[in-house]
């Protein structure tokens, strides 16, 4: 993956040096369990839960959570923070990927006469304050919070992709594109939020007559975010080529992203954690589905190809 021509974003909130819960003025726990989180509180608690030791039913898998209280328990928000462009290698990488998503989604929205308001990406280590449920913790994986329109990312998850999930080769350039896919997936949730898709999905989940039906809607949301990540990658690559610049995607990059998508599919994670698969409990989609929908967006470069809610084959 070539980073040279990607623009940097100043919408990065770097909390990595704060430790603990930045700005919270004291510790507080993540209010999970007992139906304490609604889908409106945390729409996508990232790409994983269980392989890091968290029961997914406590995060996003349970109908009792999806139909839980409409107002999550939230600690008093920290003081306003400054965003900037980080200067370390990892921070600049994240900034460049985020900057690229901003450029591409601004263009897509502008074509429809809409304004794209980019999310803020919060970098942290260990744990930090979030407006969804009170806290972000590294074991939750990356996630998007609709309440504050921020993406939360503990970059240690990138190490997990290579070492624990074996989604890419440690230290390789292709591993960077797998990491970019993770960021683009979460930004995809922000796009869904701006387009009104997430609120409609929330309403549909609350009206669902079973846990399996509510989970199915969540899978549709997640697979669409995978597809939108593919759309971003296609558009950035084609734009650079049209400008006479080398594409930012290099040989092996897409394959690495597909390996990552497969590694964090619900069936793969369930089989690894439990030894068996329960399809009705899926919340993000199978390995095959995640690969296919990312590829759908990447090959088409069109948002219209990402309508998982109307597709005959999910």
Question: Model segments located where?
Answer:
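Catalytic zinc-binding patch centered on the HExxH motif and its immediate surroundings
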Residues: 127-164
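Active-site recognition of the HExxH zinc-binding catalytic motif
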Residues: 47, 105, 153, 181-194, ...
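Post-HEXXH active-site segment of zinc metalloproteases
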Residues: 193-218, 222
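Pan-zinc metallopeptidase signature
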Residues: 262-314
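Long amphipathic alpha-helical segments used for membrane anchoring, targeting, substrate engagement
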Residues: 1-81
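Extracytoplasmic
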Residues: 93, 100, 116-119, 137-140, ...
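Short helix/loop segments within enzyme catalytic domains
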Residues: 92-116, 213-269
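Short pre-active-site segment immediately N-terminal to the catalytic Zn-binding motif
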Residues: 159-182, 213-219
């Amino acid at each position: 993956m070539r980073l040279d021509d990607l623009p940097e974003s100043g919408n990065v909130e770097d909390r990595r040096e704060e430790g603990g819960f930045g700005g919270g003025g004291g510790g507080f726990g993540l209010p999970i369990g007992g139906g304490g989180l609604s889908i409106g509180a945390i729409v996508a608690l990232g790409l994983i839960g269980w392989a890091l030791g968290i029961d997914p039913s406590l995060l996003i898998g349970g109908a009792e959570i999806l139909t839980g209280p409409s107002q999550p328990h939230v600690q008093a928000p920290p003081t306003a923070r400054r965003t900037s462009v980080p200067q370390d290698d990892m921070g600049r990488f994240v900034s460049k990927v985020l900057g690229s998503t901003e450029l591409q989604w601004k263009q897509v929205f502008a074509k429809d006469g809409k304004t794209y308001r980019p999310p803020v990406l919060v970098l942290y280590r260990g744990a930090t304050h979030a407006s969804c449920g009170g806290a972000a913790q590294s074991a939750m994986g990356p996630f998007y919070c609709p309440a504050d329109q921020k993406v939360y990312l503990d970059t240690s998850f990138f190490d997990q992709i290579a070492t624990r999930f074996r989604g890419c080769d440690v230290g390789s350039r292709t591993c960077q594109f797998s990491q970019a896919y993770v960021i683009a997936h979460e930004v995809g949730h922000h796009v869904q939020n701006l387009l009104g898709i997430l609120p409609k999905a929330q309403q549909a989940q609350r009206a669902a007559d079973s846990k399996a039906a509510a989970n199915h809607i969540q899978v549709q949301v997640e697979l669409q975010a995978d597809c939108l990540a593919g759309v971003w990658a296609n558009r950035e690559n084609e734009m650079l080529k049209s400008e006479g610049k080398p594409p930012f995607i290099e040989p092996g990059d897409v394959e690495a992203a597909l390996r990552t998508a497969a590694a964090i599919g619900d069936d793969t994670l369930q089989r690894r954690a439990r030894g068996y698969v329960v399809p009705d409990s899926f919340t993000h989609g199978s390995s095959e589905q995640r690969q296919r929908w990312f590829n759908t967006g990447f090959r088409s470069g069109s948002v219209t190809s990402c309508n998982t809610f109307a597709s005959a084959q999910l």
